[in-house]
């Protein structure tokens, strides 16, 4: 991460106000000020990292737990029928704030916004080789 604090770090530190919905030692969550739908929240690690793969295992684990807890509460409180969890890494992926963050976007029967993408058929030979390389890279 750069030396300059992200807007999210500044929110965590209380420099900017927000509508907080959750906080623990590792995670901070608040309502998005430009929501896609009612109940749209951002879930961020307190650890400053630009990309998901740069987070510590502990922050990653705590984010996973928080996403589940917050999603459940959003569904119960808003009456949403479904939700999207979106996380972008890098500008080509649509990331505009370079501090890891997840969007939980509630969906309602009248919701029209979709994150559906055009798909392609996978080449089985290429897929086999790629899967082996990714697997080896994890070990």
Predicted segments with their positions:
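HIT superfamily nucleotide-processing domains
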Residues: 1-139
């Amino acid at each position: 991460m750069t030396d300059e604090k992200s807007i999210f770090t500044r929110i965590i530190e209380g420099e900017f106000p927000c509508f907080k919905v959750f906080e623990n030692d590792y995670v901070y969550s608040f309502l998005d000020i430009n929501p896609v739908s009612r109940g749209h929240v951002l879930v961020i690690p307190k650890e400053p990292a630009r990309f998901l793969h740069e987070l510590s295992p502990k922050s990653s684990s705590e984010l996973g737990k928080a996403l589940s807890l917050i999603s459940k509460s959003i569904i119960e409180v808003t009456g949403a029928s479904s939700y999207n969890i979106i996380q972008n890494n890098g500008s080509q992926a649509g990331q505009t704030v370079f501090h890891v963050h997840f969007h939980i976007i509630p969906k309602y029967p009248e919701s029209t916004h979709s994150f559906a993408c055009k798909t392609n058929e996978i080449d089985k030979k290429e897929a086999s080789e790629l899967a082996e390389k990714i697997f080896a890279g994890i070990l």
